[in-house]
Amino acid sequence: MATRRALHFVFKVKNRFQTVHFFRDVLGMQVLRHEEFEEGCKAACNGPYDGKWSKTMVGFGPEDDHFVAELTYNYGIGDYKLGNDFMGITLASSQAVSNARKLEWPLSKVAEGIFETEAPGGYKFYLQDRSPSQSDPVLKVTLAVSDLQKSLNYWSNLLGMKIYEQDEEKQRALLGYADNQCKLELQGIQGAVDHAAAFGRIAFSCPQKELPDLEDLMKRESHSILTPLVSLDTPGKATVQVVILADPDGHEICFVGDEAFRELSKMDPKGSKLLDDAMEADKSDEWFATRNKPKASG
């Protein structure tokens, strides 16, 4: 499965300005592209909402060889209830630790050389105070699971991920498609996984010809297919094919055809300006305030 790639994790954003400040100024990521949409996504990329929304990709380098964050902002939604499903992203960056201290962004030491911080909305990030040993500082995404063995069967046997580490006592496992890619860490928890409204989505690419086979495999194994194979359009950019799956705990997983995605995900030198212009033009808070209405909760 060396042809598969870990691409990004999707976050729902309630305050775009503060969130961009965190990713850009605290973590030190750059805006790779920014896209505005007038209506909801056919694959529910922005969540189960059908109004105006935007997508901003941020990362430490081009999407071809970096795991990045997708920030989805729904103009009419002001809050998303957090669940226990997303347990954090770990990255190696002494610069991010230094930035957080300089900007007085809250940091708490959780182990020697490791600090916990939160993005707006409560999403946890773990910063290792060291230089990255690979070109991409993003090391792993940690998701909660209710039954580690069942999850390992799904992610490894069905989705073809290699198991890099497994600790029965600590109920955790580390998986990935390649040594130099961001890994997926599965952490067993007591009780059920609660996705609430802030739930995200992890995305991978594979050769486009594998998408129908992947969908057929999930049908045969009686696993969830949230969105059967569909084409997604982005104004002025490449059309991609995706299938959206869910693992045994309901974590959303997007598989996208790699060839078209490499076209779509090319870095846009105007991305940062497009985002800044969109934030400046966003009067949704004022619109709701003048009508004495709160934005809806997700």
Curated annotation (Swiss-Prot):
Domain of life: Eukaryota
Positions bearing Phosphoserine: 131
Pfam family name, one: GLOD4_C
One GO term describing the cellular component: mitochondrion
Domain VOC: from-to ranges: 5-130, 137-258
Major place of residence: mitochondrion
Keyword Amino-acid biosynthesis: no
PROSITE patterns: VOC (PS51819)
Entry keyword set: Mitochondrion, Phosphoprotein, Repeat
Subcellular location: Mitochondrion
Residues where N6-succinyllysine is found: 109, 273
Entry similarity comment: Belongs to the glyoxalase I family.
Subunit and partners: Interacts with NUDT9.
The name this protein goes by in its record: Glyoxalase domain-containing protein 4
Organism expressing this protein natively: Mus musculus
Name of encoding gene: Glod4
